[in-house]
């Protein structure tokens, strides 16, 4: 996700190749030099595939939790060719936005979501790859104008589908992924607390 304007912004994750991300930005009228930082939610490949090349090629700083940075180091993604930093518990100011993390439940080292507060007093929460919606997630996204949240399965279809048993168990666990029903049950709470857009 690119969050910002035509002059500057940040990426939340970079799960495609660097070239795909550069091309997508260009298609949308954005220059890669507008990207001032990459905030990583967790170390799974579908969230970090382009991080190392983008950050190295364009001197983009990477922010993540301590656990995620440690996992990236173990994967050889911290190659010394770009700057990285543990996200501050008080938030980080980048591209005229305040970006704060909140913990999420997923099967990785230390996953998180982000709340982005803009200079014009708008707020956006991004919560992907959640096993369940904890009170910490609920409190973090409460009142945000826009909430981007992922749910990716119907429980019955998953249970009766072709996936191996262990994968089904992983997806359904509290460190897996939200079901569509669980997510939809929360949407009314978001709206009651001021959210006007859900993606």
Regions found by a protein language model. Name each.
Residues 126-138:
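Active-site glycine- and acidic-residue-rich loops that bind
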Residues 11-15, 35-43, 63-66, 125-128, ...:
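Active-site neighborhood of phospho(di)ester-bond hydrolases with catalytic His/Asp-centered motifs
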Residues 3, 42, 62, 99, ...:
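Divalent metal-coordination and catalytic microenvironments
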Residues 8, 58-61, 192-198:
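A short helix->loop->beta-strand "cap" motif at the edges of active sites that frequently abuts
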Residues 66-121:
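Metallo-beta-lactamase
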Residues 135-199:
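Cap/insert and terminal regions of metallo-dependent hydrolase folds
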């Amino acid at each position: 996700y690119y969050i910002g304007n035509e002059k500057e912004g940040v990426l939340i994750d970079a799960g495609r190749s660097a070239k795909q991300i550069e091309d997508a930005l260009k298609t949308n009228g954005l220059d890669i030099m507008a990207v001032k930082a990459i905030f990583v939610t967790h170390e799974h490949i579908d969230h970090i595939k382009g991080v190392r090349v983008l950050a190295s090629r364009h001197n983009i700083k990477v922010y993540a939790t301590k656990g995620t940075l440690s996992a990236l180091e173990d994967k050889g993604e911290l190659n010394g060719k770009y700057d990285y930093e543990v996200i501050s518990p008080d938030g980080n100011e980048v591209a005229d936005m305040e970006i704060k993390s909140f913990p999420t439940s997923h099967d990785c080292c230390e996953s998180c979501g982000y709340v982005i507060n803009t200079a014009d007093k708008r707020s956006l929460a991004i919560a992907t790859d959640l096993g369940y919606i904890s009170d910490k997630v609920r409190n973090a996204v409460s009142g945000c104008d826009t909430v981007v949240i992922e749910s990716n399965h119907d429980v019955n279809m998953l249970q009766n589908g072709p996936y191996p048993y262990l994968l089904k168990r992983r997806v359904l666990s509290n460190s897996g992924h939200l079901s569509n029903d669980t997510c939809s049950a929360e949407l009314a709470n978001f709206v009651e607390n001021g959210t006007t857009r859900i993606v």
